[in-house]
Amino acid sequence: SYILTLKDKPEGVFSIIEKETGDHIVPIFDELDDCERYAIQLSEAETDLTLQMIEIDKEFIVSACEDRDQKYAIITPDDLLIPPDNVVL
């Protein structure tokens, strides 16, 4: 699996703010292509974020999120994720 982080700061995990609740949700991508595509879309949205893709064990990142009560979403090849207006790390 893959996540997005701040470039050279893997502890700065990228998250999306859910509009209705304000919850931060970490997208966890099953496929590198989907992660790359999303990162490109973010850069084209002129977010001023310098992101990098990190390959990570899915069980590890899911467990880390659950341990911290951090919401997450598994992005499969069948999902379409488009960057929202409110991007947060």
Q: What are the functions of these language-model segments?
A:
Residues 1-89:
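Conserved NAD+-utilizing ADP-ribose enzyme module
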